[in-house]
Amino acid sequence: MTKEQFIADIRAGIPETLPEPQIYDTSINHAPKRKDILTAEEKKLALRNALRYFPKKFHATLAPEFANELETYGRIYMYRFRPTYEMYARPIDEYPHKSQQAAAIMMMIQNNLDKAVAQHPHELITYGGNGAVFQNWAQYRLVMKYLSEMTDEQTLVMYSGHPLGLFPSHKNAPRVVVTNGMVIPNYSKPDDWERNNALGVSQYGQMTAGSYMYIGPQGIVHGTTITVLNAARKVGGDNMKLFVTAGLGGMSGAQPKAGNIAGVVSVTAEINPLAARKRHEQGWVDELHENLDELISAIRKAVEEKRVVSMAYVGNVVDLWERLAEENIHVDLGSDQTSLHNPWAGGYYPVGVSLEESNRMMAEEPELFKEKVQESLRRQVAAINKLTADGMYFFDYGNAFLLESSRAGADIMGENGKFRYPSYVQDIMGPMFFDYGFGPFRWVCSSGDPKDLETTDRIATEVLEEMRKTATPDIIGQLDDNIHWIKEAGKNKLVVGSQARILYADSEGRTKIALAFNEAIKRGEISRPVVLGRDHHDVSGTDSPFRETSNIYDGSQFCADMAVHNVIGDSFRGATWVSIHNGGGVGWGEVINGGFGMVIDGSEDSDRHIRQMLLWDVNNGISRRSWARNKGSIDAIKREMERTPGLTVTLPNFVDDNIINEAYK
């Protein structure tokens, strides 16, 4: 397809003539059939809802086709309308646009749907099994059309993938406001998602999937590297560490690369051969093993030789854990990144049942499938418990492993009624990073030029090294890890999709790096605008009692004021787009999370937006964490108040335990 044809296709939106039906591409990793949950009348409603995107002249042709999709796949994806052009993040100037900010958003959307990046690209799923950009291809086409037409005096409103329309606003307002899965709390159970999504009225946006901010597995590589590094430090000793986990999907696929960067032997189980081979072909995992005998031998050899290597076991994770326990292999670090936020719809596959049979069972015999999953979790936990008794440090990686294992009746609870194992936020990420404002800051070079990315890496390194000279002792370790990360980033070949980078930085670091980028754009040192953003998995963006806010102990870990305030505050301080989601990470109904994107172009407006918005985006969460009496956050917010005129935060007073105990003796 020529550039002119691409531009015409974007501008057309819903085509005037029906495109030809497309052949189902079996070389692409597809989403499993979803649960058949709708009644006969609800299926008619789903069909009526889908057809409202199209003129009447198409209805007679599309109605049976969409009905067949609903019966075959459990959703109406509108495959016929999937564009025939290649999906990837093009340089910003290749998109038809009246607003440069809108063109940047188009680039970010296409990156989320790139087949090299997305988990189920033809079903518009970026990662996590159900993390959707849109619900169907009509929504994609309309959104791209609107973005190509809009000006900086308009805002596009997005309801769970559906473009409500373009509304008049002003240049300092967000260009796009996104909500995903915002349902009434009483209707936020997993089956409510299944029903609403099948009806075409809501979607699960995960975190960066539905907010157009995914940068491929690099995003999670950095967080996983930091987690594994610090977990290894907790374990101590100078032996070669063995790290065992599961999942090679859109997010979990980062684990082998993170293991290599952290300098360990890693073994990652993955049930889906397509996913495992994809990561191997991309160079994100070194070895594939399908035979447990050969794998065990390879593990022993690598540990003995102290050879850093990443291995993938193409099979069920329970078989792996049980074999490790049976062989008395010493595992130093253990975790799990299966998509247990979505346990009944392809996020976790039970032991003893093939991938194909599981996909059939979850759609046709959902109750039996649930029983198999829960039985599998009980066996997995039993094997993990045996290995932790022999010295393994196990941590929950925020995927609802502990939560779903407890619901399955596994031996996962301690004597105090709390989980036997910590979440990684409780033990590592929370007290060492989030409490001090360090989180997953990221940027994308809209030129698509690797040279621009190299320039940003150099600038970020210079900023962090300068900060380190005057840093307090409690954050020097965090700065050192991130300086090392950014210096090695190019060598580690982390880019998949757009020219993007991530590093963990605090409020001061993010602001100084962004201002330095903006100055470099102004000078022409960086050739085109840069998109700033972050994962929702951050200091302020997410309220999640089993992950991001699991180290909040004042009882407010189940409250979502922080995440909601964050997106509101970002929206009027300079964000180019904002999003707020139900779910993300731990699952639908368990989390409220939000994010932003900011296009900086070398202007004074960008300078102002950087200073105002990034300060709020980080310090909102530090303030909340300090009120929860987290010591690191109290220290961090005191430093910020000294640094920032006009910032006044309410600080907690500490009560002597004896006074409390005396009052309730």
Walk through the language-model features, giving the residues of each.
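Core active-site phosphate/anionic-ligand binding loop and the adjoining beta-turn-alpha structural block
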Residues: 294-513
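Short, charged/polar "capping" segments at the starts of alpha-helices
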Residues: 275-277, 404, 540
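N-terminal ligand-binding/catalytic initiation module
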Residues: 1-236, 375, 429-579, 586-587, ...
